Curated annotation (Swiss-Prot):
The keyword Secreted applies. Induces contraction of intestinal smooth muscle in isolated guinea pig ileum. Induces proliferation of mouse splenocytes. Expressed by the skin dorsal glands. Belongs to the frog skin active peptide (FSAP) family. Rothein subfamily. The lineage of its organism: Eukaryota, Metazoa, Chordata, Craniata, Vertebrata. GO terms for biological process: defense response; positive regulation of leukocyte proliferation; positive regulation of smooth muscle contraction. It is found in: Secreted. This is Rothein 1. Changing S8A: Abolishes mouse splenocyte proliferation. The keyword Secreted applies. GO terms for cellular component: extracellular region. It comes from Litoria rothii. Keywords: Amphibian defense peptide, Secreted.
């Protein structure tokens, strides 16, 4: 996703 927090894949 497009966000400031890290996800599984930070796109």
């Amino acid at each position: 996703s497009v966000s400031n927090i890290p996800e599984s894949i930070g796109f």
